[in-house]
């Protein structure tokens, strides 16, 4: 899964990143359906003078989509997803590796 992230107005990047490191990422990595979580700051566009359309990109290695659905329904994850919604707008893309 690829997640595209933009912070909401007024959210400081340091606050968001600290919340990710302290609360969100450890919980996601505890999920049976997730093997890996990697977050990236987007700094610029290659060969373009414009601003990047997203501030962060996250890759999540999921081993079982059905299990992910069950994992996300847990009380802990619902609470954390609510917190995430206060920090950022996210677009989640379910992807399949082909190369």
Predicted regions, residues:
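Macromolecular interaction modules
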Residues: 1-99
């Amino acid at each position: 899964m690829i997640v595209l992230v933009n912070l909401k107005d007024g959210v400081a990047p340091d606050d968001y990143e600290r919340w990710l490191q302290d609360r969100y990422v450890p919980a996601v990595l505890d999920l049976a359906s997730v093997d890996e979580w990697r977050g990236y700051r987007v700094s610029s566009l290659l060969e373009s003078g414009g601003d990047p359309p997203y501030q962060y990109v996250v890759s999540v290695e999921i081993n079982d989509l059905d299990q992910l659905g069950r994992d996300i329904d847990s009380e802990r994850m619902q609470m954390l997803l609510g917190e995430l919604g206060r920090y950022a707008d996210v677009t989640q893309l379910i992807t399949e590796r082909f190369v």
